[in-house]
Amino acid sequence: KEDIVMALFERYQDALAEVTGEGQGHTQSIDDLWLLVHLSFEVIQDYQFIHRDLSELCAAFPPLRRRFVRGLESGVSRLSAHCRTLAAAGSLDATHEEARALATNVALVTTYWLNLRTLQRPTGSAAAMVDDDALSQGVFQVMSLITPYLRGETQEEFRRVARRYLPQGVRHC
């Protein structure tokens, strides 16, 4: 069973690496940032069993835990660097420490969003699968963490894009 879990986790990591451009010289614009959030949630949807049962999987398979932690730390470092680049360009207002804290909070929400949504479902509902609305709301939550740090037109555009991820009835409340 461990071989199967580790093979699936490797596919998950490969999919995330492709989305995040790990090891590639991607430009680091605001558009890259929201697209990164969106595509990361698509990968999470494809491999939701990992996120939904993360604590249990990591407890049962210590090698998985080690690899997940390394991947998480790498992601936080890359996002923190992305935020510092945006800050240097004047698009984002954050110190190095705030950029690191923002990256950590993004990782926290992204990693555990499915757990929260599953807990919020009524007992006995189709909690095994997370729908597109739940993932869209996760994208919105992450983008809402980033938006206050943005400046000027960049902030307003990011906010407009973020609102598109809200369910129809919630958009104008």
Indicate residue ranges for each PLM-predicted region.
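An amphipathic alpha-helix adjacent to DNA-recognition modules
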Residues: 1-21, 34-38
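Alpha-helical bundle regulatory/interaction domains
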Residues: 8, 33-36, 41, 118, ...
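Secondary-structure edge/capping motif, primarily at the C-terminal ends of alpha-helices
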Residues: 20-24, 51-58, 86-90, 117-124
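Non-transmembrane, amphipathic alpha-helical segments
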Residues: 25, 32, 36, 60-67, ...
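Helical hydrophobic small-molecule/effector-binding pocket
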Residues: 31-55, 73-81
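Short, hydrophobic secondary-structure boundary micro-motifs
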Residues: 52-55, 67, 95, 158-159
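Amphipathic alpha-helical packing segments from all-alpha helical-bundle domains
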Residues: 63-89, 100-115, 133-148
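C-terminal peripheral helix-coil segments that are non-catalytic and often amphipathic
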Residues: 115-173
